[in-house]
Amino acid sequence: MGKQKQQTISRFFAPKPKSPTHEPNPVAESSTPPPKISATVSFSPSKRKLLSDHLAAASPKKPKLSPHTQNPVPDPNLHQRFLQRFLEPSPEEYVPETSSSRKYTPLEQQVVELKSKYPDVVLMVEVGYRYRFFGEDAEIAARVLGIYAHMDHNFMTASVPTFRLNFHVRRLVNAGYKIGVVKQTETAAIKSHGANRTGPFFRGLSALYTKATLEAAEDISGGCGGEEGFGSQSNFLVCVVDERVKSETLGCGIEMSFDVRVGVVGVEISTGEVVYEEFNDNFMRSGLEAVILSLSPAELLLGQPLSQQTEKFLVAHAGPTSNVRVERASLDCFSNGNAVDEVISLCEKISAGNLEDDKEMKLEAAEKGMSCLTVHTIMNMPHLTVQALALTFCHLKQFGFERILYQGASFRSLSSNTEMTLSANTLQQLEVVKNNSDGSESGSLFHNMNHTLTVYGSRLLRHWVTHPLCDRNLISARLDAVSEISACMGSHSSSQLSSELVEEGSERAIVSPEFYLVLSSVLTAMSRSSDIQRGITRIFHRTAKATEFIAVMEAILLAGKQIQRLGIKQDSEMRSMQSATVRSTLLRKLISVISSPVVVDNAGKLLSALNKEAAVRGDLLDILITSSDQFPELAEARQAVLVIREKLDSSIASFRKKLAIRNLEFLQVSGITHLIELPVDSKVPMNWVKVNSTKKTIRYHPPEIVAGLDELALATEHLAIVNRASWDSFLKSFSRYYTDFKAAVQALAALDCLHSLSTLSRNKNYVRPEFVDDCEPVEINIQSGRHPVLETILQDNFVPNDTILHAEGEYCQIITGPNMGGKSCYIRQVALISIMAQVGSFVPASFAKLHVLDGVFTRMGASDSIQHGRSTFLEELSEASHIIRTCSSRSLVILDELGRGTSTHDGVAIAYATLQHLLAEKRCLVLFVTHYPEIAEISNGFPGSVGTYHVSYLTLQKDKGSYDHDDVTYLYKLVRGLCSRSFGFKVAQLAQIPPSCIRRAISMAAKLEAEVRARERNTRMGEPEGHEEPRGAEESISALGDLFADLKFALSEEDPWKAFEFLKHAWKIAGKIRLKPTCSF
């Protein structure tokens, strides 16, 4: 048939000609079968033959329509009739069409059924070479992806090409939606030979994606770019449940303490990390806030019903700025109402499924026991934690990831006795992981300490920084490892490292056996590999591709073989430590885990079952290496395909004989194989199928070839199904090695963290901290300490300070001084150095001797929390209340300007009472910054335990007697003594407050200070407040002194307003002295 000429633009948009006047027969219309939906993606020779026969029997080319027929004359009254009908609707009442009365196409019917099963999922339905959205999903896709949505039959629809699936899934997931991918579950070849050959393709939900499950799902990173990924950040799914508890009451009838008990389970599905905790929490939910801030979840699962305050806090945390996804689950979903029974039942099902599919694993489990979640472990968990665990099980079951919770070795409690949990306030106010300017990592303590080379090392270091150690032996072990690596660095440079690495086949060999060279080469090689921690978890979930599997196993094998050259074994005795390459106990333990023969041998064994060349060229059907005892069904399917292909290839001989062409060969064009190409004038049998042609040749498929290709396509599809089942079985067998591989990757991450801390200690003038025994008094002794973050900015211009706090001596410092003098920087510096030391890092000081702290608590800055319904002062006192309840005698407490959010009298009283409680009841180490001089009087009640300090400065008076017009030079050095001036007007000038406002403020300050001075003098003399009349000679002399001082200030003052205030006050004093003639001078 000839190709019809494309219409012009004007003809394309012209109204169509009217249909014939006769009405169609309704009976005939109903009897016609539904339209056939063709969404085939593979070649079907039999279908091509049927199409060819149909075209051959078709009528010849139809004559062209006349121009008048194709482009009718426009009706001038058409627009007028449209407006009349639009503005004057029919008086008949409009009855909307119900869903039951609609006539759906077969594809739409499938979509309706799928949407009824998954109402909360945005579905991407595979239709041919595109993924289509329907209804509301199409509108969401149009808004998020920026694509066009239009009406098609009964639904709005939009689509994206199949090769861009990965990119668009990530964008939709990142926008907070749950995405379901619906794929065709049959191919054209299988469909053409099945009972459904005339119906639509069968489709089913093949994958679900959310923010917490995306990285653990099938590899969809292709084509998305780095900016769309989630990088090295954790993607925790956190489930929260709570229940009411009876609040404690104070004697005055005010409720206090805790009102709920909270259970939390957090799962990092992409790494297999599972954390849990149960604790009492107060009305402000400060404990829950600390957990949420520490885990930084990507998704929250709320167990309903939740208390109103918990729900309010979590919803506010997952606001638009945080981009955290929220999903709710009812606790009524348990079949028998018992969460414990539900978890045990799920674990038994998973265990039975694992062991049933793998006989070797069953024997191994019987011999030594699997590392899994046992009934004993579940029964020992707190009640609410089990509820949260059951909800998490049920939630992950829809994604197929519930098996990760079965790995009991991954579980750890957040309230470990060996780790310190920093509160949400401490993490935020000390800028431990994020800065307070833009919320990024730049400028934080973690960013300053992070010199890791791998993403999983960076994740582990983040955990170390937010959870410092509380065990002196563990801290010393880390410091020993850091010291040894730092000493080994010596004069080695990165250029020497690269020259000492040579290639030996597919492996890297190390010329020098020195430990640092081995460690650096391994970490450098791992930095160039993929995220193997998430890789082994995807393998465990059976979502990894063959290329990723090979890359992960090769990385683990490379690391293990290189570190094996150090000759360190797990059962080595201490007697060989003197001659050993590595002496640190922690380093030897980590090295032995990575280079374990079990890990290396299993990695090699798994790689030997795969065809790397086939994986590189993308031949998925030839990836698995078959043998007599391995994948027998796959071997049979491959053999069947090979036999059919050989039969087809051998049939060329018969065609040579039939056509009398000796050199006839099959031709392959555009992926179509076994073509017979003949000249245009050649005569061929009538049943030969014409496939394509050129000017001089025509290419055919004889009936034998058509039948053979059909048989080959069917055998190939069967091979693909068997291959997928064999690959899934191969991945399932990985479960028995998962624990060993996970431990090896975790050890690699720990080595990377220790190497990072060693780099930090060498790049800057850091010192190893010393820790006193636990039985000794708590102390902090830092000489020439420096702020670890500000020092990187100021370099040599930073001014160091000493800090000495001792439980049996001075354990509280009250710090005063001018604004912008460095008070907050100093107290932050002490806290950050303490945290760094307990992380196991060297610290920025010339000497550091500390006691292991069980907590670092801070109350700094002024901020409200409107979304949580908290004012600035409530937020301030809530943080102080949390500190008072939580701290102990082994804690470091930092309070910065407590009480400034209310009136002066209330603020001073609250600050004084809080500090007195900490000193008398808790006896913890305290750094207290204040602008209230009255607070310093507390040192009288605690002689020798409280010291007053201020940040030093120099002043230069412009004019003698001037008030607050001094030039101030900040020295940033902490010295003993109380500072009574804050130089607030200097800060006002720096902030560019209008000069008129500053002058007026100075005038008011002078007046207020004069009144306060008079009030204090009257108080000393025993006069009632407000009575300023001098009595007796001494009072008159004092009044004259004030008179002359005011006159002196007025004469030297440049500002007329200020001078006037001094003169006015002097006039009042003179008037009072004049009215007392009995006074003798």
Swiss-Prot record:
State the residue spans of region: Disordered.
Answer: 1-77
**BP-aspect Gene Ontology terms:** mismatch repair
Listed InterPro entries:
DNA_mismatch_repair_MutS-lik_N (IPR007695), DNA_mismatch_repair_MutS/MSH (IPR017261), DNA_mismatch_repair_MutS_C (IPR000432), DNA_mismatch_repair_MutS_clamp (IPR007861), DNA_mismatch_repair_MutS_core (IPR007696), DNA_mismatch_repair_MutS_N (IPR016151), DNA_mismatch_repair_MutS_sf (IPR036187), DNA_mmatch_repair_MutS_con_dom (IPR007860)
Q: What is its main location?
A: nucleus
Q: Which family does it belong to?
A: Belongs to the DNA mismatch repair MutS family. MSH3 subfamily.
Q: How does it assemble?
A: Heterodimer consisting of MSH2-MSH3 (MutS beta).
Which PANTHER family does this entry report, sorted A to Z? DNA MISMATCH REPAIR PROTEIN MSH3 (PTHR11361:SF122), DNA MISMATCH REPAIR PROTEIN MUTS FAMILY MEMBER (PTHR11361)
Q: What is this protein called?
A: DNA mismatch repair protein MSH3
Annotated organism of origin: Arabidopsis thaliana (Mouse-ear cress)
- Tell me the organism's taxonomic lineage: Eukaryota, Viridiplantae, Streptophyta, Embryophyta, Tracheophyta
Q: Which gene encodes it?
A: MSH3
